[in-house]
């Protein structure tokens, strides 16, 4: 009997698929473990270089002036991200909030934001003012900031000729590394570098801005080492390691990070304010553990992709391809299969395993969405979770996994629940 069946009830044919998937995945697991080891050593070196001490984890109150722990954490982030400076704060509520602060920090009335990888993720449409619902609520467009985009080509690759054509009129070139609700692979660093080079050749002053959500530590370098001036991400995704309870980061050129700090706090205050309360230890520890946790999440993705292929699905990316984020997408084909898959993930979660996810309206989304997330941190997507809009072809987006052993059990139960009910 499989060890898995000591704890969950799997059918024999499902366990046979698990055995086959584990065999096929081994070389790709080893590749990710090599990336993990490199990134972990890079992380260790940054901590040592900063001379971080136990007293830096104590936190501050009130204004947060002279907070050495906050300053050292931002120094560590900058070094690991290949950046000049970083803004790492618990006051950032989500990835969307962090992106909004950064965009408002960089753009002024009359400036143009160029989306070089097509329409951004649904929740950012509301920040820009593209969803038609936020007029008068303080969107970028409300402040006289213009929007332009270079749609991806039919094969989901960037349209470099169109980027070159539109870049001269833009202040910021926005690159979304992960897929959002598109069925494409995440962009690798070579693609980010090529977009940056194309935009700069047409406009040397343009700011290359990368939404790095879901992409941190999937490779041995980060977008600042591939042409980005500024990168943005969330601490309840990859860089928080499943431990940081909230927060986000902005890293890149020192002058641009300072502009973002003015937007987060107030003009004239910049990075000098912002108390850390009781969060420093969790933020330090989460970031330190992040390379290992991201490796576990990608091993989960590789396993899920292989398993899905064995049941006839076509996941993106394939298990044998490079991984540039922690997300897997696949067409569940029916609403029942999508709902069943999500309920399987929920049933093998450490938190709220008894809950049965149901499709429902969600702020920032145009269709009903079903979400499964039995996570310790609300909304965390470095923890095993999945979601998808209730529209054909019922595409499911799977991400996260703090450790492979538990995540393997969850994915296997999800596949059984979706495709082996009878």
In which residue ranges do the predicted regions lie?
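Short glycine-rich or small-residue beta-strand-to-loop segments that form or flank ligand, phosphate
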Residues: 60, 87-90, 326-331
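Conserved C-terminal alpha-helix-loop-beta "cap" of PLP-dependent enzymes
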Residues: 309-421
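N-terminal small-domain helix-loop-helix segment of the aminotransferase-like
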Residues: 63-69
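Phosphate-/polyanion-interacting regions in eukaryotic proteins
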Residues: 2-9, 100, 107, 112, ...
């Amino acid at each position: 009997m499989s060890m898995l069946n000591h704890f969950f009830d799997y059918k024999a044919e499902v366990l046979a698929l698990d055995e086959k998937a584990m065999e096929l995945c081994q070389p790709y697991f080893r590749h990710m473990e090599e990336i993990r080891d490199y990134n972990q050593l890079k992380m260790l070196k940054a901590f040592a270089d900063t001379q971080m001490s136990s007293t830096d984890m104590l936190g501050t109150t009130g204004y947060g002036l002279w907070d050495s722990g906050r300053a050292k954490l931002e120094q560590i982030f900058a070094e690991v991200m290949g950046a000049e400076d970083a803004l790492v704060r618990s006051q950032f509520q989500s990835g969307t909030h962090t992106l909004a602060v950064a965009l408002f920090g960089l753009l002024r009335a009359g400036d143009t934001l160029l989306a070089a990888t097509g329409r951004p993720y649904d929740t950012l449409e509301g920040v820009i003012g593209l969803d038609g619902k936020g007029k008068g609520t303080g969107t970028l467009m409300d402040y006289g900031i213009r929007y332009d985009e270079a749609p991806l080509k039919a094969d989901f690759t960037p349209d470099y000729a169109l980027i070159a054509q539109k870049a001269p009129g833009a202040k910021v070139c926005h690159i979304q590394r992960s897929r959002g609700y598109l069925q494409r692979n995440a962009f690798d660093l070579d693609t980010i570098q090529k977009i940056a080079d194309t935009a700069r050749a047409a406009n040397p002053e343009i700011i290359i801005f990368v939404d790095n959500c879901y992409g941190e530590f999937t490779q041995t370098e980060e977008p600042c080492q591939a042409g980005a001036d500024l990168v943005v991400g969330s601490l309840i995704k990859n860089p928080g390691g499943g431990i940081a309870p909230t927060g986000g980061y902005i890293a890149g050129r020192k002058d641009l990070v300072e502009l973002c700090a003015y937007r987060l706090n107030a003009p004239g205050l910049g990075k000098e304010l912002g108390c850390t309360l009781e969060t420093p230890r969790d933020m330090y520890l989460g970031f330190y553990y992040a390379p290992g946790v991201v490796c576990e999440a990608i091993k989960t993705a590789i396993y899920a992709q292989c398993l899905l292929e064995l049941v006839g699905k076509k996941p993106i990316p394939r298990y044998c391809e490079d991984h540039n984020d922690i997300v897997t997408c696949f067409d569940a084909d029916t609403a029942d299969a999508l709902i069943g898959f999500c309920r399987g993930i929920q049933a093998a979660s450490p938190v709220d395993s008894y809950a049965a996810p149901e499709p429902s309206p969600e702020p920032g989304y145009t269709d009903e969405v079903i979400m499964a997330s039995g996570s310790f941190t609300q909304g965390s997507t470095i923890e095993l979770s999945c979601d998808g809009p209730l529209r054909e072809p019922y595409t499911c987006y799977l991400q996260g996994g703090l450790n492979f052993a538990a995540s393997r059990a969850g994915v296997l139960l999800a596949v059984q629940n979706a495709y082996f009910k009878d």
